[in-house]
C-alpha cells in the first residue's frame, strides 16, 4: 500500500482505549476507520503487556506466547498468529515488511482488531502502527483533560509542567511529552524532562494515560492548552513543519555542543544540514527520510571520546572455547573495551573452586575452563576483563540455604539472599573471591548484590538469628525491640538504628572484602554495581561512603530507565573523589528506544560520567544497538583508562589542547596554544583560570587516573598457578565457530543471568525462559522489573 493513498479521516478518537491494558477493542480495522497501535519498542525484548515491531532482521527471536500480525513489504497484513501457536516461535520477519507483536491484553486486543488483507503502515517517527481495511489516514485531532499543573505526579494524575528550564522531577515509570514555545511536540517518552523555554511538558503515570500520549502525542503534532484541556492535532501542513521544527532543535543542539566544547566535525555537520529542504516533504515516507537524515546529523554531535570506558555485562552461555573467542571478537568489533563477566548465575559457578560450599559448579566447567578462555580471548583482543560476582545473592538458593537472611515475617525471600551478618558465609564468599583473584589474570573485580534485598515499605530483611544477635550486641537493643521493628517498620522509634546497623554492616563487609583482595592483587581495580535508588533504607547500600573510604575504586549505578540519566549521573558524580571513577549502567535489556540509547550515551559524558556499561550483551546486540553504535558514536576505538593508564593520560593531554583551541575559536578570542609538555597540575592550573569546567574535564580525569593508578603494581607475581586448561589453537582462531556455539541463536537454554546489574540474561535465550505459559511470563517479568527498577 502506497502513502499516496491516504485519505482524510477528520476528527476521530483513534482507538486509544483499544490499547489500554486489559481493555477491549471497540473499533476494528474492517470498519474502514484507521486505528492506531502505539508501539513500545523496535526489535526489543517482548515483555509483558507491550507492543513491539520487528523489522530489518531475519526473525523476531521471541517465544510463541505473543500475539503476532505479519505485514508484507507492500504494507498488507498477510498473516495472524495467536499467542501460544508454535508458528509464532522465532517468527520470520518479511523482507521490507514487519511483524507487529504484543503480549497480554494489549497484544490480544491488537490481534483481534486486525484482519488479513488490511493495510498497515509503521510510522517509526511517531512510534505507531496505522491499520485500516481501507485507505490509511495518518491525520487526526483530539482533546483530553489534565488534572494539575507543576504538581507531584501521583497515580491517577495527568500533569502539565510549564516552568521553563526546570525538570519535572518524575521517576522512571511514566511517559512524558515535551512541547516547544511554538506549540509543537518535540519529543515523546522518558521522564524527569526539562521544560522547554516557553513550552511545557505533559506527564502521565497511569497505563491508560500513557497509551493516550503514545497514540496521539507524536513528535511534530500541534499541542494547544485551553483551560484544563489539551488539544492535539496532526494534518498535512505539519509534515514540512515537523522538519522545520526538527531543524530548529538541531540548531539548538549545535549551539549546546559548542558551548560544551565537544570535539566534533562542525563543518561536516553544516554541509549536511545545507542539503535539507523541508519543501521536499509531502507524506510520511518523505518525512521519515528527511527525519532520519536529521537524526543522523544529530548523532554527529555526540563526541567520540578517545578515553572512555565502553563496557558490557554478560553471563557466558558458550559451550566451547571457539565460541568464547567468537563472542569476544564480536565485542571488539562493536567497540566494546571492557567486559564485566558474570561468573556466577543462579547459584552456579563457571569456575570449579576446590571445596566450594556456597555454589554449585556449572556443568560446562568440567569440559573446559571458561574463565581462563575468556582471560586469553580478552587479552588477544585488548579488552579489559572485569569479573562480576554476586556477593549476597544466592540465585536458586540450593547452595546457600544455611546462610539465608529472613524477612520480617520470618520467611526466605525468592531471591535467596544470604545474611550479611553470617560470618561463615562471608568467609566462604571471601575464599571464592580470593581463589578467582589468585588463579586468573583478570583486570578487575566487581561486587554485585553487595546489599540487602529491596525494602518496599512492607517486606524488610535481616531478621535471621545472626543479624539479630549482632544488632543486640552493637546497640544493646533486645529481642523485644527487634520484634517491634519487624511489625512497625518505619513507624518504630528505633527504625533508624536498625537501618544504620544494616548499612554499617554492609560497609564493613565491603571494606573487609576489598582489604583481602588488595592484599592478594594490588594491581587490579575494584568496583561495585550499585542500585540507582539511594534512599537510606531501600538497600542499605552506601556507595558514597565506600568511595570516600577508598574501599572501592569505582561504581556502576544501574540507572536503567528512560529519562533519568542526567540527574542520576550528577547524583553519583557528586560521590566521586580525586581517585575514583563513575561508569553509568544502561538498561539495554529494557528495550529502550534507539533515540534514548543515543541520548544516554551522550548524557553520561556531558553530566560527569567516565563511561557507560550496557546491560547486557545479548540485548545490546539483539535490539540493534550494537549495529547502530558501531556506525557512528562507537565507530572509533576508545581507551579504557583502567586498562591503558599511560596511553589514556597522553590522549587526554591531546584532547585538552584541542578543546582549548575550540574554546578560542568559538569565543572569538585569541590565545596561546596549550603546552602539552607541562605537568598535569600545571595544565590544569592554566585551564582552570578561564573558569570553564568543560576546558578542564580532560585533565581532571587524567589527574584522577594518575592518582588511582595501579601501573606500578603491574607485572607482579600474584597468581598461585595458571590454569592448565589453555585454549587450543583452534579456539584462538575462533572465526569458524558455529552460531549455536557462540550463544547467538534462539535456543531453549536454561542459562540465565543472575546479576544485580540485571537479571535478564542473554536476550536470545530469555524469551524461552520466560515462556511456558503467558501467566508465568507476566509473573517472571514482574519479578525482574520489580527488582531492577527499584
Regions found by a protein language model. Name each.
Residues 410-545, 549:
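Polysaccharide-binding and catalytic clefts of secreted carbohydrate-active enzymes
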Residues 718-763:
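C-terminal low-complexity, Ser/Thr- and acidic/Pro-rich disordered "stalk" regions positioned immediately N-terminal
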Amino acid at each position: 500500500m502506497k502513502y499516496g493513498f491516504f485519505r482524510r479521516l477528520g476528527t476521530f478518537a483513534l482507538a486509544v482505549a483499544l490499547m489500554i491494558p486489559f481493555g477491549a477493542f471497540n473499533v476494528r480495522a474492517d470498519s474502514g476507520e484507521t486505528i492506531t497501535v502505539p508501539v513500545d519498542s523496535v526489535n526489543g525484548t517482548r515483555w509483558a503487556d507491550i507492543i513491539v515491531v520487528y523489522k530489518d532482521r531475519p526473525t523476531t527471536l521471541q517465544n510463541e506466547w505473543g500475539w503476532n500480525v505479519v505485514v508484507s513489504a507492500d504494507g498488507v497484513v498477510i498473516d495472524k498468529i495467536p499467542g501460544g501457536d508454535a508458528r509464532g516461535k522465532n517468527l520470520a520477519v518479511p523482507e521490507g515488511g514487519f511483524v507487529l507483536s504484543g503480549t497480554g491484553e494489549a497484544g490480544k486486543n491488537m490481534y483481534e482488531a486486525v484482519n488479513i488483507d488490511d493495510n498497515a503502515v509503521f510510522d517509526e517517527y511517531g512510534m505507531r502502527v496505522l491499520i485500516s481495511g481501507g485507505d490509511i489516514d495518518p491525520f487526526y485531532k483530539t482533546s483530553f483533560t489534565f488534572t494539575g499543573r507543576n504538581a507531584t505526579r501521583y497515580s491517577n494524575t495527568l500533569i502539565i509542567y510549564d516552568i521553563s528550564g526546570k525538570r519535572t522531577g518524575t521517576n522512571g515509570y511514566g511517559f512524558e511529552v515535551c512541547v516547544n514555545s511554538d506549540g509543537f511536540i518535540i519529543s515523546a517518552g522518558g521522564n524527569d524532562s526539562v521544560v522547554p523555554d516557553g513550552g511545557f511538558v505533559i506527564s502521565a503515570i497511569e497505563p491508560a494515560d500513557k497509551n493516550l500520549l503514545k497514540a496521539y502525542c507524536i513528535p511534530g503534532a500541534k499541542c494547544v492548552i485551553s483551560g484544563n484541556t489539551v488539544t492535539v492535532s496532526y494534518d498535512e501542513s505539519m509534515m514540512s513543519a515537523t522538519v522545520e521544527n526538527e531543524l530548529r532543535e538541531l540548531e539548538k543542539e549545535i549551539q549546546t555542543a559548542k558551548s560544551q566544547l565537544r570535539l566534533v566535525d562542525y563543518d561536516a555537520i553544516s554541509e549536511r544540514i545545507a542539503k535539507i529542504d523541508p519543501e521536499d516533504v509531502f507524506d510520511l515516507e518523505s518525512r521519515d527520510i528527511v527525519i532520519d537524515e536529521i537524526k543522523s546529523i544529530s548523532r554527529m554531535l555526540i563526541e567520540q571520546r578517545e578515553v572512555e570506558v565502553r563496557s558490557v555485562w554478560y553471563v557466558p552461555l558458550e559451550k566451547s572455547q571457539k565460541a568464547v573467542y567468537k563472542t569476544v571478537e564480536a565485542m571488539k568489533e562493536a567497540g566494546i573495551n571492557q567486559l564485566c563477566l558474570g561468573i556466577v548465575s543462579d547459584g552456579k559457578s563457571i569456575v570449579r573452586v576446590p571445596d566450594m560450599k556456597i555454589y554449585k559448579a556449572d556443568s560446562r566447567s568440567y569440559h573446559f575452563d571458561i574463565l581462563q578462555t575468556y582471560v586469553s580471548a580478552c587479552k588477544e583482543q585488548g579488552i579489559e576483563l572485569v569479573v562480576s560476582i554476586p556477593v549476597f545473592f544466592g540465585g536458586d538458593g540450593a547452595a546457600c540455604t544455611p546462610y539465608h537472611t529472613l524477612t520480617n515475617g520470618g520467611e526466605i525471600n525468592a531471591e535467596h539472599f544470604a545474611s550479611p551478618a553470617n560470618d561463615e558465609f562471608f568467609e566462604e564468599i571471601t575464599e571464592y573471591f580470593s581463589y578467582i583473584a589468585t588463579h586468573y589474570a583478570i583486570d578487575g573485580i566487581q561486587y554485585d548484590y553487595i546489599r540487602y534485598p529491596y525494602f518496599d515499605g512492607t517486606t524488610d530483611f535481616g531478621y535471621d538469628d545472626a543479624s539479630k544477635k549482632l544488632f543486640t550486641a552493637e546497640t544493646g537493643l533486645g529481642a523485644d525491640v527487634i520484634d517491634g521493628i519487624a511489625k512497625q517498620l518505619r513507624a518504630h522509634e528505633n527504625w533508624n538504628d536498625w537501618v544504620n546497623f544494616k548499612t554499617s554492616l554492609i560497609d564493613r563487609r565491603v571494606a573487609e572484602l576489598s582489604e583481602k583482595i588488595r592484599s592478594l592483587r594490588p594491581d587490579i581495580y575494584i568496583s561495585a554495581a550499585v542500585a540507582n535508588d539511594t534512599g537510606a533504607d531501600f538497600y542499605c547500600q552506601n556507595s558514597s561512603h565506600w568511595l570516600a573510604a577508598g574501599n572501592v575504586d569505582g561504581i556502576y549505578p544501574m540507572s536503567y530507565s528512560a529519562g533519568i540519566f542526567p540527574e542520576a549521573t550528577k547524583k553519583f558524580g557528586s560521590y566521586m573523589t580525586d581517585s575514583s571513577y563513575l561508569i553509568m549502567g544502561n538498561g539495554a535489556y529494557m528495550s529502550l528506544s534507539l533515540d534514548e540509547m543515543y541520548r544516554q550515551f551522550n548524557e553520561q559524558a556531558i553530566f560527569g560520567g567516565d563511561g557507560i556499561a550496557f546491560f547486557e550483551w545479548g540485548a545490546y546486540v539483539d535490539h540493534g544497538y550494537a549495529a547502530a553504535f558501531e556506525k557512528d558514536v562507537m565507530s572509533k576505538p576508545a581507551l579504557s583508562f583502567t586498562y591503558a593508564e599511560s596511553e589514556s593520560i597522553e590522549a587526554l593531554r591531546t584532547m585538552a589542547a584541542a578543546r582549548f583551541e575550540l574554546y578560542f575559536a568559538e569565543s572569538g578570542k585569541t590565545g596561546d596554544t596549550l603546552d602539552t609538555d607541562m605537568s598535569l597540575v600545571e595544565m590544569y592550573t592554566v585551564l582552570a583560570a578561564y573558569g570553564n569546567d568543560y576546558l578542564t574535564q580532560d585533565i581532571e580525569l587524567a589527574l584522577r587516573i594518575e592518582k588511582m593508578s595501579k601501573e606500578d603494581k603491574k607485572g607482579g607475581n600474584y597468581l598461585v598457578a595458571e590454569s592448565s586448561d589453555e585454549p587450543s589453537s583452534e579456539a584462538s582462531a575462533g572465526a569458524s565457530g558455529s552460531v549455536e556455539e557462540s550463544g547467538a541463536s534462539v535456543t531453549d537454554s536454561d542459562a540465565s543471568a543472575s546479576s544485580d546489574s540485571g537479571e535478564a540474561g542473554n536476550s536470545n535465550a530469555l524469551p524461552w525462559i520466560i515462556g511456558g505459559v503467558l501467566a508465568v511470563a507476566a509473573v517472571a517479568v514482574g519479578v525482574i522489573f520489580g527488582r531492577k527498577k527499584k
